[in-house]
């Protein structure tokens, strides 16, 4: 749940360079951001804290609210009209904080993180899941479903506030990231299964995101400025890329999107223990919490704002001059070349992988 930003720079300015694990990180400049839409909250949903691109009906984005609602909605990237509303029984825990999608046993699922606990006094945490329904705005604009529910506790026996969830298609694993003020956030995991029933699962601790000394110390009651207050995360559908964002609602522009590229055979846990790359194109969003991948070259963010209509931002990988995404640009077809079992794009500057990296 978002709180008021009371300090920092103006929202149009980018964050400073990030100190993480004791190092000042270099920016990743391979991405650009554009506003693709504006969410009409009168027709859709307010306080969007989680989003996930539909895999069953491409072109739509699922959204959930942390405003004690018992439903999720789908809209397109323009955000003007609601395409679908999925309602759940009111008995489902209400403090939802993030949304993710993934594949399990050849079916597409949506996962809702019902684990918000700002005061760290609740202890009633779960991940709600459902098989993703098809979106048909004309014939089924509203659906009622009964989802599954996986209850969990943390391995340290403590209560934690959490606002970020991501799912790894390669290992069918759910990852949960705590939201911590003035300290580092922690990553936990559990395997996804359909047969947990009422059994409460104990998460596995994975790692901390950075170290405590990264955050600095308050001066004249000013808050810490490093990477804490994580609000959203996602893993690309093929498992290759990881995004984790924070939203510093106290020092506004000390907010970043961190990016990891997994190596072949590398686990999510091992990837997260390496240094990330903060994305230079990102600048502070008012109450911006939600993030999701569309594909390896595109992702979205939007805001938890409950007043006004928040923007929907689209991030696309930069391509060398004359090259756009070869998957969606028909003019690129004659530039594709197969070497062994790998597809590349030819340009005057050389060969590039399909995610825009030059082959040296």
PLM regions and their residue ranges:
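Sequence/structural signature of beta-propeller domains
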Residues: 15-320
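C-terminal outer-membrane/trafficking sorting elements
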Residues: 321-360
